[in-house]
Amino acid sequence: LLLALLVALACAPARANAAEVVLLHSTDRDDARTRALARGLADALTGRAAVVPVLLGRRERGDDYFDSRFETLRRKFGERSPAVVVADGQAAFAFVRKYREDLFVGSPVIYCSMPAPDPQYLRQCGDCTGLPETADPAATLKLLFTLRPQTGLIVGIMDDSPETDTLRRVSEEAMEAIRVQGLGQARMLFPGHEPGDDAGLDMARLRAVASSVPRAGAVLFLGFPDLEGEEAGNEGEAVRQLVSRSVGPVFAASDRWMGSGVAGGVMVPGRELGAAVGALVLRIMAGEPAGEMLPEPVTPRPVVDMTVLARFGVARELIPADAMVLNEPNRPQEPAGAVSTGFAALALAGALAGVYLLLRRRAGRKDRWPGPRP
């Protein structure tokens, strides 16, 4: 008993001082992507550090909001310096740069879920490296036409941010290239962001747009503004409205919405990104300075929901070989050692025929009985 107590006392400080990796998300809400990223990171660390996720908030919140989040986190973490701080998205990266002298002092930083930042921003975050990532709506459009070449209309949904406006221009250029290559001849429009229709989208207008998408159409979701007041809404609610009201499939360039009725897109799966972040964390924990690591861009790949695509008549054979396939319908399999249905039916028919012949033979012997009947 005394030995067990001594072992427990010796281990207690080690547990209390276990390495921490703080994962700052640039969102207010937990969703499929934040969970997948945290899970992939934890799996990669294999217990060598604890992952502490924090829903920091989206950047539209403003300075006062992030000042209050800083005070909350300072009370929570005190003087603790995590082994690594992971900034998931631009809001988290800006937060770390602004408060690094007072929070998580001396902790190396890894950024992800955002394009490569300006070099001056890298200098502001101290010992820093990252996994640059850029949304690829052009590849998502190519995937869309691979799966549904008959698509005649692409309805783009976007917010008012400069980043999303860039994605729109990339999408329009990609659509023109698709036309030139003869891969598709669809029209593309962005309701609320067209000449003569430039007032943006609210939730009521979004519902009307979703209901007007034809069967030969599809939706390309790039973003949606977080609204307040009577028509309050957010991206999650926008996706739900699109999926429930549109008779055409919805495609996106982020796996944040996979599993909620989105058909697919070309993206970096959250769990794979978490594993890549985890590999960098382990190198840092082994003593390699983060600032000396070259940023390693992550490559998106097709991700599709086969259950959703099946509703639109998309055959499994059209799915790219490198795609991550979610929710693939199970094919019925016969248990090992089971006899096939056709063979069983043939065997039954043979058995019945044998019984019939046996009865006929016995009846024939009765008709030829040599003596008087019993």
Describe each PLM feature range.
Residues 15-373:
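Short hydrophobic alpha-helices and adjacent helix-cap/hinge residues
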